[in-house]
């Protein structure tokens, strides 16, 4: 039992559960937005739905991260930056990781299935195998295409769509959640390009595909800037197509909290790119992007609650 908890602790530290902050806030924002979107608005979100969404996100992210770690263990062992991870360092065995991956897949399907009897919504169960397939795709994509950054972005971009499907399936018939998913896809794809700058030589040596390995540092930074500009455009469209997010709520102004969030996100992305130019990857990747996710979710949820 002690060994089991020790291995679980090692894996939790290795996949950095705190980095769930990149996707979970957008799932929660979508969950609050979804009841008011579509042709048949729902009365609101139930606490049980929120709990199931959080559990689904936990299982999905853990499944995705461990699948990536398992399939990449030989590449990680050859990279000084990642050689200390649990699998290449030998602190856990592949069979331990496979066991947890299977548990997470079962956990995700079970939580998705619970929406059926509890909320008469069987769409999450039907979608769960497709979600698992997409989440596993990133781990192998980098072997074949430099667009793997956007496959990762798409995996995180599933979070608002899946949450909307779970709370109010009719919400996916309207643009806001699709635009939000597009923002997440481009935002994550852009900052993953920046993060991959650290591994240019390793990726080229191992035959792994990435935009930095293909284009080099300068063109990759320009690509990331362009991608993030497109992401900001989609974020503005999210606001314009969602009444809750465009209605003024800040006293004495014509701004919603979400519109203020968009302005602040633009500033944070500018800081992120300046940090990347100075090779300050920890600041650019973790701190600033965590702030972006929390800021947008908090601002959006505040606007939704103020509309009630």
Tell where the protein language model's regions lie, with residue ranges.
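Extended hydrophobic alpha-helices typical of membrane-associated regions
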Residues: 4, 9, 230, 236-308
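The first (N-terminal) embedded transmembrane alpha-helix
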Residues: 16-35, 153, 157, 293-298
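Multi-pass membrane catalytic core of lipid/isoprenoid biosynthesis enzymes
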Residues: 21, 50-57, 73-128, 205-258
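Intramembrane alpha-helical segments
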Residues: 8-14, 62, 84-175, 179, ...
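Alpha-helical membrane-protein architecture signal
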Residues: 4-8, 25, 51, 130-133, ...
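Membrane-embedded alpha-helical segments that form the functional core of polytopic membrane enzymes
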Residues: 26-71, 81, 105-113, 122-137, ...
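Helix-loop junctions at the membrane-solvent interface of multi-pass transporters
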Residues: 33, 114-118, 140-141, 165-166, ...
């Amino acid at each position: 039992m002690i060994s089991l908890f020790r291995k679980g602790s090692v894996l939790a530290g290795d996949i950095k559960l705190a980095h769930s902050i990149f996707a979970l806030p957008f799932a929660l924002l979508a969950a609050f937005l979804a009841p008011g979107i579509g042709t048949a608005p729902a009365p609101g979100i139930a606490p049980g739905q929120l709990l199931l969404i959080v559990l689904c996100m936990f299982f999905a992210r853990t499944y995705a991260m461990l699948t990536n770690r398992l399939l990449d263990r030989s590449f990680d062992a050859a990279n000084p930056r990642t050689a200390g991870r649990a699998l290449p360092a030998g602190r856990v065995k592949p069979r331990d990781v496979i066991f947890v991956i299977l548990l997470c897949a079962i956990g995700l399907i079970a939580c998705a299935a619970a929406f059926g009897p509890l909320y008469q919504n069987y769409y999450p169960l039907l979608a769960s195998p497709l979600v698992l397939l997409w989440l596993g795709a990133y781990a192998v994509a980098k072997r074949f295409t430099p667009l793997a950054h956007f496959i990762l972005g798409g995996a995180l971009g599933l979070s608002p769509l899946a949450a909307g499907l779970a709370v109010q399936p009719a919400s996916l018939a309207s643009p806001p959640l699709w635009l939000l998913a597009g923002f997440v896809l481009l935002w994550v794809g852009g900052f993953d390009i920046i993060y991959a700058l650290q591994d240019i030589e390793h990726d080229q040596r191992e035959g792994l595909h990435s935009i930095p390995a293909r284009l080099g540092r300068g063109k990759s930074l320009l690509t990331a800037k362009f991608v993030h500009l497109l992401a900001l455009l989609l974020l503005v469209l999210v606001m314009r197509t969602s009444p809750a997010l465009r209605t003024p709520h800040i006293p004495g102004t014509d701004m919603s909290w979400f519109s203020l969030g968009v302005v602040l996100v633009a500033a944070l992305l500018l800081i992120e790119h300046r940090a990347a130019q100075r090779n300050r990857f920890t600041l650019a990747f973790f701190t600033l992007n965590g702030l972006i996710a929390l800021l947008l979710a908090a601002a959006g949820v505040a606007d939704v609650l103020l509309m009630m």
